[in-house]
Amino acid sequence: MISRTSTQKYKSAPDNLREIGKQLGVANLLEGSVQKAADAVHINVQLIRAATDEHLWAESYNRKLNDIFTVEGEVAGAIADQLNAKLRGAEKQVITAKLTSNPEASDAYLRGSALFRKSDDASMDTAQQFLEQAVRLDPGFATAWALLARLHAWQFSGSDATDARRASARAALDTALRLQPDLAEVRLAQGYYQYWVEKDYAAAARYLEQLMAKWPNNAEILGALGRISERQGHWDQAGNYLERAFALDPMSRVARRNAIDLRFQTREYGSALRLIDDGLNLQPDDLDLIACKVLVYQWLGQLDQADAVISGLHPRTAEDLPVFAITNQARFRRAYAGAISQLQALQPDRGSGSADWAFSTFNICLGDLRRLSGNASGAKANYTQARDALEALLKNQPNNADLYNMLASVYCGLGDRKAAMKNADRAVEMTPLSKDAITGAGYESTRARIEAQFGDGDHAIPALARLLKFPGYVTPTVLRLDPDFDLLRGDPRFQKLCEENPK
């Protein structure tokens, strides 16, 4: 067990080692403590067999703060000796490398790294500040430059696909490559740059596969290869990678969500539900997991079960997944008043950047519910707010296909068929299904839904039939339940698409 994300929830001297070993799927656990005094630290570590509580090895270290990283290599080597294990080259490089001699830079890097792994916009903004502080304190800190490059690349792939963000990612990566081109973290950043910025999935996979050959037990690399394989349409290979990533990092929310999403895409809903329930046993208040469970029941057409779960879904902010689950249940039930009231209480303010994305997504959801409930003026107000925010974002992100896809839905809600189709076509043209099996399928689904809302069965039905042949979110159950397809219900071709049953 190498990943920190799976172990950080446990205190340093946990009570039930056997249960923790079972949760993590490991035979041995390393626990320790650090005491700091001025510029010195005293470190205690011990290796314990989880099943028997037997102490296999223990050691103490006294170090100066600027030499603390050397302890990692000593501890790892001692543990490997005790377990008759052999550390591979890249793994040994990571744990024995002296990252920096500046303790303040080290502290800033560790804080930034912890926030980066939360993978949300709010945490990323603060993580960026810490990482920039780290490289300012130590301009030769290659590992910090590499993580800063990944952070900029992650932001570019989401809500900030601007030229400035691309340039920041490239500059940080180039600095890391100049400093230590063979460092594992730097090679990892190269792979993520190709994945998130260039969207060259073949090149990204090559970088990551080369790195995996040297670092085979890195859950992060396996997870990235899994997501890339999905986008390439290599679903079996994706499953293999994501299963291995989750096995190595079983407490990681990201690894679990990736495994769940794969099963959702491949319509293996029973398997997805088991993963969700296992996660909720560990984190019963995880709103995203609760929302995922609601969505699984919705996609199975089991709306009573979805109702039972959604009664415990009380988001405090306009989080995307819970809001979508609430909106979708109202759509499928065709009962809008309660969901409209719940969403109105969460109305976010318009901000900038990622805040505008959340603002727009929320207003599309609320606008859809008001449109379907017959409140045309209320729906128009929501769609107009979303349109204005998205158009503002588009000025600085003209190559962001997600913005065109969202604008297509907005203009459809406003009744502007020409503008809706123009934006939908633009999104599909920029990212076709042949280029990206996840995002491309989503864009084609948006276009087909718009065609259906305008009653254009001759275009919508063949598109939906095609999407049903691929992994994705279009299913016969969705076609049967979603009111956006009501204008097609009298068409025998559409009726045939609704006849199949999900797995």
Predicted regions and their residues:
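Acidic, proline/glycine-rich low-complexity intrinsically disordered segments
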Residues: 1-370, 375-382, 387-399, 404-407, ...
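C-terminal structured "cap/appendage" subdomains that terminate the fold
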Residues: 449-480
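Hydrophobic, well-ordered secondary-structure elements that form the walls
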Residues: 408, 448, 460, 488, ...
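Extended hydrophobic-aromatic, low-complexity segments
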Residues: 377-379, 417-422, 436-440, 457-461, ...
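TPR/TPR-like (Sel1-like) alpha-helical repeat modules
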Residues: 169, 314-318, 383-384, 425-428, ...
